[in-house]
């Protein structure tokens, strides 16, 4: 009888060195709205349009996107530690700087999760068609190259593509079988807030990033301009939603997303004060922005579903 005893022993020996809570901490679950929400909003939007959807493929895409996000998170942490972007005195990821994990553990975790996500993506390609292959390849390459792009002021563009435009277009194709460019109407506002998560992080870390001799977009702009850019990223999505309702490309119930505006305004005001009061006041702004992303996107999603069922 075939057993998986040796494999199970290997997994236990590797995983058993750390608690489940430590592994969970390593993958930064608070950031998952950045990957999950674009898929959820896209599914809700397509439901509102009356598209003939494969919901099983939609859920599969959601899980796969989060797995790619996990791989990207720990892959970035590994490279940030190797390049001394993250140190004991920095406020970034602490899984390596505190000695909780060894570099090879984080590297292997990134590779392992990436392989699982890639296998899931290839399976979806076989079930849906070649267009998904090119979308998936672009996303995979951008995920792997993210550290390099981030160090050369292109991280924000990478995130906008990887966590907004590509997943929304890909989700539309996977669930309906066609490329639906109208999903870009929802990709932009959701993607801008996602970019705000990264931008708040990079604005906070400008001093240690300069010491590590990397160049982020926030560093190029400077503290004041970075604060203005962040404010645009979290506030403009609300303007966009209103304009889309006026243009009748979104149903009027999506205006309920404006309920999240006070959260966005609070985040913006905090960032705008940071050039005067210092980076300490934005230590948790990336997490606050992720919460904004979740609230804004869930409200949009609920509105699309209600619009289809009720109005």
Stretches with model-predicted labels:
Residues 16, 94-182:
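Intramembrane alpha-helical segments
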Residues 33, 37-41, 95, 158-173, ...:
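Small-residue-rich segments of transmembrane alpha-helices in multi-pass membrane proteins
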Residues 67-90, 196-218:
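Acidic (Asp/Glu-rich) catalytic motifs at the cytosolic membrane interface
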Residues 39-41, 50-75, 133-140, 144, ...:
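Membrane-embedded alpha-helical segments that form the functional core of polytopic membrane enzymes
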Residues 2-60, 152-158:
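Topogenic membrane-insertion module of multi-pass membrane proteins
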Residues 88-127, 215-250, 287-296:
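Multi-pass membrane catalytic core of lipid/isoprenoid biosynthesis enzymes
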Residues 159-212, 224-228:
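Functional transmembrane core segments of multi-pass inner-membrane proteins
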Residues 246-307:
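Extended hydrophobic alpha-helices typical of membrane-associated regions
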């Amino acid at each position: 009888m075939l057993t998986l005893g040796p494999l199970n022993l290997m997994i236990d020996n590797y995983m058993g060195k750390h608690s489940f809570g430590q592994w969970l901490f390593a993958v930064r679950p608070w950031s998952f709205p950045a990957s999950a929400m674009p898929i959820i909003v896209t599914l809700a939007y397509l439901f509102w349009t009356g598209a003939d959807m494969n919901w099983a493929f939609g859920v599969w895409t959601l899980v796969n996107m989060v797995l790619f996000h996990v791989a990207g998170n720990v892959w970035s942490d590994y490279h940030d530690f190797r390049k001394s972007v993250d140190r004991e005195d920095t406020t970034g990821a602490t899984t390596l700087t505190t000695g909780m994990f060894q570099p090879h553990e984080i590297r292997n975790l990134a590779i392992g999760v990436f392989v699982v996500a890639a296998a899931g993506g290839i399976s979806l390609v076989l079930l849906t068609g070649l267009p998904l292959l090119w979308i998936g390849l672009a996303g995979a390459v951008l995920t792997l190259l993210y550290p390099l792009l981030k160090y050369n002021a292109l991280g924000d563009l990478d995130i906008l593509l990887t966590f907004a435009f590509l997943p929304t277009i890909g989700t539309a194709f996977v669930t309906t079988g066609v490329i639906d460019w109208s999903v870009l109407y929802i990709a932009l506002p959701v993607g801008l807030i996602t970019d705000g998560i990264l931008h708040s992080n990079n604005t906070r870390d400008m001093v240690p990033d300069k010491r590590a001799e990397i160049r982020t977009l926030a560093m190029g702009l400077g503290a004041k301009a970075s604060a203005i850019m962040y404010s645009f990223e979290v506030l403009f999505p609300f303007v966009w939603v209103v304009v889309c309702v006026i243009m009748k490309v979104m149903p009027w119930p999506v205006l309920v997303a404006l309920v999240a505006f006070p959260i966005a305004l609070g985040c913006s005001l905090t960032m705008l004060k940071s050039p005067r009061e210092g980076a300490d006041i934005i230590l948790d702004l990336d997490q606050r922005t992720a919460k904004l992303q979740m609230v804004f996107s869930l409200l949009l999603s609920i509105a699309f579903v209600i619009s289809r069922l009720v109005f």
